[in-house]
């Protein structure tokens, strides 16, 4: 019974007629649905990606910290009673797809996020691989106490394409390397990008051009 705000990027040609693929873009801890717009400069990056020939897409940024709580996009995080994951799949995606001209289907739906949202995007794509064609996790948290264990989900079949991008100076660099090795050990195809950088918006803004291109290239026509 609560109001859940979100932000949306609509392509320049959006007219309420044509349908577009959709990217769900998740924020990090202590953030909100405005972060990718305000700090990540999403609008100019998305416009530039379109101008460079990328597929036009709708980009949706949910609020993953209701009441300012970091709940890692899961149900009952650390014993709280908030069923965020259930809300995301049962209410939020259907709401977006009925209120915007979204081309629904796995081949035209992707998910990405940073830090806590990197965890959320990996978790959701492992939980519902039939829902997403790609997941792009920037500086992801991969082992969270009180949240679902990603390592226990590595047996999931038919996973979407996966990219993990992380800075060599990031405090999560070691855990991301361990998760990359676990992906490889499970025979899960993935792209792993490391470059100079730390856990900050300068790094995450630098992820956006690659993220948008990878998702665009993966979307079905």
Description of each model-found segment:
Residues 1-221:
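Non-catalytic cap/lid and distal C-terminal segments of serine-dependent acyl enzymes
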């Amino acid at each position: 019974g609560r109001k859940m705000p979100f932000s949306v990027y609509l392509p320049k040609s959006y007219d309420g007629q044509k349908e577009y693929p959709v990217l769900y873009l998740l924020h990090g801890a202590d953030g909100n649905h405005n972060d990718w717009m305000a700090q990540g400069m999403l609008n100019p990056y998305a416009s530039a990606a379109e101008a460079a020939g990328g597929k036009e897409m709708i980009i949706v940024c949910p609020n993953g910290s209701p009441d300012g709580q970091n709940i890692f996009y899961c149900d009952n995080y650390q014993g709280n009673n908030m069923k965020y994951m259930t809300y995301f799949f049962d209410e939020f995606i259907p709401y977006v797809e009925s209120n915007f001209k979204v081309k629904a289907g796995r081949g035209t739906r992707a998910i990405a996020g940073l830090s806590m949202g990197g965890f959320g995007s990996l978790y959701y794509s492992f939980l519902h691989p039939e829902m997403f064609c790609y997941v792009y996790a920037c500086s992801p948290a991969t082992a969270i106490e009180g949240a679902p264990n990603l390592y226990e989900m590595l047996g999931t079949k038919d996973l979407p394409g996966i990219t993990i991008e992380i800075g060599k100076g990031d405090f999560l660099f070691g855990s991301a390397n361990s998760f990359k090795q676990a992906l490889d050990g499970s025979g899960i195809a993935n792209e792993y990008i490391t470059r100079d950088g730390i856990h900050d918006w300068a790094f995450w803004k630098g992820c956006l051009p690659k993220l948008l291109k990878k998702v665009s290239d993966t979307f079905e026509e």
